[in-house]
Amino acid sequence: MAKRRKGRQVNGVLLLDKPHGLSSNHALQTVKRIYFAQKAGHTGALDPLATGMLPICLGEGTKFSQYLLDTDKTYQVTAKLGIRTTTSDAGGEVVSEKTVDVSSEQLAKALDSFRGTTKQVPSMYSALKHQGQPLYKYAREGIEVPREARDITVFNLELLRFEHDEVELNIHVSKGTYIRTIVDDLGELLGCGAHVAHLRRSAVGNYPVEKMITLPELEALLEQANADEITPSDVLDPLLLPMNSAVDGMHCVYVDDMSANFLRHGNPVQAYNQPEAGSVQVYLGEDENDADAEFIGVGFINDDGLVAPKRIVVLEQY
């Protein structure tokens, strides 16, 4: 008999405002403890020195974390000109120091070269894996691993501030884009070097910024609930966004009880409103006007033109 997981089944997505100096995994484990959740997973690590939006998927919501990994993101970054570091951020060792003599025109021209779709070689100080190990582990041992340049897209790049040796940017990018690499490349293009002084992720996909919450706020809610002898879940769970928020924008199809049961057992079905191809959100309900329609997971259109299960929600009542 399989060992039962410790914790409760709580499902959803928490928009954590990750603090400076904390690893994404440490933040994840803290949220998991506060919620006493059986399962938890984040949707793309933020560097310890970075702050901002870190969606934490709980319970069955972890099945859909990959879709948030694949979505675009927005950052506010402050680049320090004149100093290049090993890690391209403030935590690395200084590689070079140069005098900053950059005009507004030079900066504008350099920034324009990053807009649109370009190639980027991932930083050695990244979580990308090579032979099962993250690149940053090789980097710490002084080992340089060959990396292929990848297509990235900078949808929007706005200059917020330029004061001598500091450049503040708002940047909206595709998945897999490394901001520290953009800043390092910018410094090389300007001929003076640069590194990330401050980095904040302000958006992941279409998630609302106002729904973010900090760890101290969560801890305070838990402490107050215990002091008032209130079940913590009564105050914590309303902070969660629904699981289907992770696949917002994906085409929706609708099935009846029998078809839902078939999907839960791994079988493809015919669905209402299904497209000819691609991934789909699957709901137990009549159609898009059914206010009680229940999200049961993500499927895809197979070669037979049926909706096949890909990530199906399994709740305790089933």
UniProtKB/Swiss-Prot annotation:
What this protein catalyses is: uridine(55) in tRNA = pseudouridine(55) in tRNA
**Catalytic residue list:** D47 (nucleophile)
Q: Which Pfam families match?
A: TruB-C_2, TruB_C_2, TruB_N
**Gene Ontology biological process terms from the UniProt entry:** mRNA pseudouridine synthesis; tRNA pseudouridine synthesis
Query: What keywords are assigned to this protein?
Result: Isomerase, tRNA processing
Where does the source fall among the domains of life? Bacteria
Q: Cite the EC number.
A: 5.4.99.25
Instruction: Give the matching Gene3D superfamilies.
Output: Pseudouridine synthase, PUA domain
Q: Name one GO molecular function term.
A: RNA binding
SUPFAM superfamilies the record matches: Pseudouridine synthase (SSF55120), PUA domain-like (SSF88697)
As for what it does, the entry says: Responsible for synthesis of pseudouridine from uracil-55 in the psi GC loop of transfer RNAs.
Provide the family line: Belongs to the pseudouridine synthase TruB family. Type 1 subfamily.
The entry's protein name is tRNA pseudouridine synthase B
Organism for this UniProt entry:
Colwellia psychrerythraea (strain 34H / ATCC BAA-681)
